Amino acid sequence: MGAYIMRADEMAKRLMKEDNQLKQQIIEAFGDQSYNTDGSLNRGYLAREAFENNRVQELNALVHPHVRQATREEIKNAEKKNFELFVKEAALLLQHDRPEYLDIIVLVKADPEKRIQWVAQRDGVAPEQVRARMQWQQSDQSMEQMTDYIISNDGTINELKTKARKLIEELKASES
């Protein structure tokens, strides 16, 4: 497909580890315990602070501007490398407004219980922790209003890939 894929969650984790300005902002806001003695991010501590002490918006306000800037840089890199398509995978993409730097937004929807199961398994956390995180996310209905296309992830991974490829082909055909 020639797609450049950027995963915002991975980008945020990398920036929180490597971006010295962001690290300093996090330490100032959340304390030295935000990072382990080896300099690695203390994800457990930050997750507890954010989700149990209602500081999610505070953490997001620090991290998201850095992710947006990194996204713009990634888009430029993808263009230089002649990728046909730039894909940003981001659960929190539409938290505030529709990003002006993206031409088309596709919402991939799945049953909430399936999402909880997938994230719990991926992150090695309890389903209750995932539910608490999801409470900070916008509802599917509000996100649907800001998207151009919706893909239902109600089958296998291969079925999802087929749906995505079909949409990409439709978009390419409409450009011609």
Regions found by a protein language model. Give the residues of each.
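ATP-dependent small-molecule kinase phosphotransfer cores
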Residues: 10-84
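A conserved segment at the C-terminal end of the G1
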Residues: 1-7
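An amphipathic alpha-helix signature
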Residues: 1, 23-27, 112-117, 127, ...
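ATP-dependent NMP and nucleoside kinases share a basic, alpha-helical "lid"
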Residues: 72-80, 85-122
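Residue-level signal for inorganic ion chemistry
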Residues: 9, 59, 87, 151, ...
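Hydrophobic "anchor" residues on beta-strands that sit immediately upstream
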Residues: 5, 84-85, 144, 148
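Small-molecule kinase domains that catalyze NTP-dependent phosphoryl transfer to phosphate-bearing small molecules
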Residues: 71, 100-101, 121, 125-172
